[in-house]
Amino acid sequence: MSSAPNGRKKRPSRSTRSSIFQISKPPLQTGDWERRGSGSESAHKSQRALDDCKMLVQEFNTQVALYRELVISIGDVSVSCPSLREEMHKTRTKGCEMARQAHQKLAAISGPEDGEIHPEICRLYIQLQCCLEMYTTEMLKSICLLGSLQFHRKGKEPGGGSKSLDCKIEECAETPALEDSSPSPVDIQQHSWQVSTDIENTERDMREMKNLLSKLRETMPLPLKNQDDSSLLNLTPYPLVRRRKRRFFGLCCLVSS
């Protein structure tokens, strides 16, 4: 390094000083970028699948609540029976489809049966199980109520029919036409056939949901299978172990106005 005219050494320029202390980082290899990108993309897909499953279970929960409200309305004189049964059929069909989709999505994101389980997945399993149990219970209630209404409509005589057809015709002849509001025998027979069809369809859907509930219990991860009913509410971080009990706020079947 040359000396300055006054005897002092020249200081290195600013660019030279910065280059001296510059730390060079080795560039990432192509494989590192791919691994980092694939890991982030996989985590994003998993979270998106979890969110979709959570939304689907919540929608099924709401559908079960709506069906329950319809079941409670069976026998209400202010509700038209044909329109009520049609609405129940639509709601029940939509709920069964949601239940099947929720089970498929939940089974896809749960991972290995003996592996660690995320608390949110555990919660979704419990919510779906509770909703299915309530759903089948409400279907059984609707079958009992529809059958009871059908029985009372036919009459309470031991023979199953209230009055003979001749008696009905005589009563209709004695009553003025403008005041005759009683249904005809043909209407009664058609109504009875429709109610019987609704009962059969409800029984079919109830059996399907019971089978789905059995599949759900079979495909549950081992940490959930090994827990009893009281400890299922202790959704602790994975791996799932028994800790002190805490309250479970995942309520089922609430309809917000």
Curated annotation (Swiss-Prot):
Q: Which GO terms describe its cellular component?
A: cytoplasm; glutamatergic synapse; neuron projection; nucleus; postsynapse; postsynaptic density membrane; presynaptic membrane
Disordered: region residues: 1-45
- Provide the alphabetized UniProt keywords: Cell membrane, Cytoplasm, Lipoprotein, Membrane, Nucleus, Palmitate, Signal transduction inhibitor
Q: Name one GO biological process term.
A: negative regulation of signal transduction
The biased composition feature labelled Basic and acidic residues covers: 32-45
Q: List locations, semicolon-separated.
A: Nucleus; Cytoplasm; Cell membrane
Query: Coiled coil located at which positions?
Result: none
**How is the polypeptide modified once translated?**
Palmitoylated. Undergoes rapid palmitoylation turnover. De novo and turnover palmitoylation are both mediated by ZDHHC2. Palmitoylation regulates the cell membrane and nuclear shuttling and the regulation of GPCR signaling. Upon depalmitoylation, it is targeted from the plasma membrane into the nucleus. GPCR signaling inhibits depalmitoylation and promotes localization to the plasma membrane.
> Which InterPro entries does the entry link to?
RGS7BP/RGS9BP (IPR026512)
What disulfide bonds does the UniProt entry report for this chain?
none
Chain's role: Regulator of G protein-coupled receptor (GPCR) signaling. Regulatory subunit of the R7-Gbeta5 complexes that acts by controlling the subcellular location of the R7-Gbeta5 complexes. When palmitoylated, it targets the R7-Gbeta5 complexes to the plasma membrane, leading to inhibit G protein alpha subunits. When it is unpalmitoylated, the R7-Gbeta5 complexes undergo a nuclear/cytoplasmic shuttling. May also act by controlling the proteolytic stability of R7 proteins, probably by protecting them from degradation.
What is the protein's name according to its record? Regulator of G-protein signaling 7-binding protein
Species of origin reads Bos taurus
Its encoding gene is what? RGS7BP
